[in-house]
From Swiss-Prot:
Places the protein is found: Nucleus
One GO CC term, this protein: nucleus
Biological source species: Danio rerio (Zebrafish)
Region (RED subdomain) residue spans: 97-145
Low complexity: compositionally biased ranges: 169-181
Sequence segments annotated as region (PAI subdomain): 22-78
Disordered: region residues: 146-184, 221-242
Name of this chain's protein: Paired box protein Pax-2a
Composition-biased stretches (Polar residues): 146-165, 229-239
Coiled-coil parts of chain: none
Length: 410
């Protein structure tokens, strides 16, 4: 049966071809795997030039919309209505002439992009729209044929690789490291890698005993023996193990005994210094009875000089108290005060410059509120004592309820 009208361009197609194709949804006949005839392609382009929409062209010629769009897109891009090659491989566009031109462009401008090379090939007439290689093909040509990798030969001197009009010059081979074969252990060091000759070993020798510092903390002594061996962590605190590594002529017997006493002393002394750290003559010199006469001499001169300079217009004063008086003045609940060594040895001018004038006077040091350990001693400010927050409702007695009373009950 013939479903084509007289004006249908498919009327030239025989019904024997229907076995390989069929009828599309628009009623047109197509042959599976074969392109549209050139007559239909030309008609599609003519209708498109007349301003007919692709959907109207598809319904009028009874060709699928995808086929019309593909033909028009190829025409707008390349200006050709010919179908693509079906089957087989595409014609080779990377001819030796094209490869040579691409290599020449890259030598002139190594940063030239592939699309710039493609445009230049078209501008210079080396290729036309049908034979110009694609951007991916140009990148592949540059990667495989223009910039071939360098393969050094077995003798260590690279062999220059060359293509048509393009030559890659190998870089100078680095000299082998001389110490790699001689010293397998030293070859992994920085000197071995850089090929620096090893210095004389005699210069690196040290004395039999090398002290790392002038301090002895009783736990560790820094030294390096000539044989490279030293006491382990278990024997560092042992005097006997240390003596084994000390030479007999390095220290005298008295020095060794002094070291023994230092090692036997605990690492962390008490907070209060003991008498063993002070020599007998120093203990007599800095004892409290020896310091009292000096303090008695300083007290009158200090009081008279300060009072004469400051005047008598001071409202509240705190005179300097000597060590003997302060030792006898003891507050309840506190240990007796022991004056530090050298108290009272400052000159009058120095004390006057260190403390403001309002803090010194010759009046006696008397504070009656500190005589007993009570609430008044704890809170010297009477304003704080009268505050309702420091007393409960029972201690205040009966009275009208206030906000503070409610606060205490809660």
């Amino acid at each position: 049966m013939d479903i084509h009208c007289k004006a249908d361009p498919f009327s030239a197609m025989h019904l024997s071809h229907i076995g390989h194709g069929g009828v599309n949804q628009l009623g047109g006949v197509f042959v599976n795997g074969r392109p549209l005839p050139d007559v239909v392609r030309q008609r599609i382009v003519e209708l498109a030039h007349q301003g007919v929409r692709p959907c109207d062209i598809s319904r009028q010629l009874r060709v699928s919309h995808g086929c019309v769009s593909k033909i028009l897109g190829r025409y707008y891009e390349t200006g050709s209505i010919k179908p693509g090659v079906i089957g087989g491989s595409k014609p080779k566009v990377a001819t030796p002439k094209v490869v040579e031109k691409i290599a020449e462009y890259k030598r002139q401008n190594p940063t030239m992009f592939a699309w710039e090379i493609r445009d230049r090939l078209l501008a210079e007439g080396v290729c036309d729209n049908d034979t110009v290689p694609s951007v991916s093909s140009i990148n592949r040509i540059i990667r495989t044929k223009v910039q071939q990798p360098f393969h050094p030969s077995s003798d260590g001197t690279g062999t220059p690789l060359s293509t048509a009009g393009h030559t890659i010059v190998p870089s100078t081979a680095s000299p082998p490291v001389s110490s790699a074969s001689n010293d397998p252990v030293g070859s992994y060091s920085i000197n071995g890698i850089l090929g620096i000759p090893r210095s004389n070993g005699e210069k690196r020798k040290r004395d039999d005993v090398l002290w790392s510092g002038n301090h002895l903390d009783g736990r560790k002594i820094g030294y390096h023996g000539s044989d490279g061996s030293g006491p382990n962590s278990d024997s560092q605190g042992s005097v006997e193990s240390l003596r084994k590594h000390l030479r007999a002529d390095a220290f005298t017997q008295q020095q060794l005994e002094a070291l023994d006493r230092v090692f036997e002393r605990p690492s962390y002394p008490d907070v209060f210094p003991t008498s063993e750290h002070i020599k007998p003559e120093q203990a007599n010199e800095y004892s409290l009875p020896a310091l009292n006469p000096g303090l008695d001499e300083v007290k009158p001169s200090l009081s008279t000089s300060v009072s004469s300079d400051l005047g008598s217009s001071v409202s509240q004063s705190y005179p300097v108290v000597t060590g003997r008086e302060m030792a006898s003045t003891t507050l309840p609940g506190y240990p007796p005060h022991v004056p530090p060594t050298g108290q009272g040895s400052y000159p009058t001018s120095t004390l006057a410059g260190m403390v403001p004038g309002s803090d010194f006077s010759g009046n006696p040091y008397s504070h009656p509120q500190y005589t007993t350990y009570n609430e008044a001693w704890r809170f010297s400010n009477p304003a704080l004592l009268s505050s309702p927050y420091y007393y409960s409702a029972a201690s205040r007695g009966s009275g009208p309820p206030t906000a503070a009373t409610a606060y205490d009950r809660h």
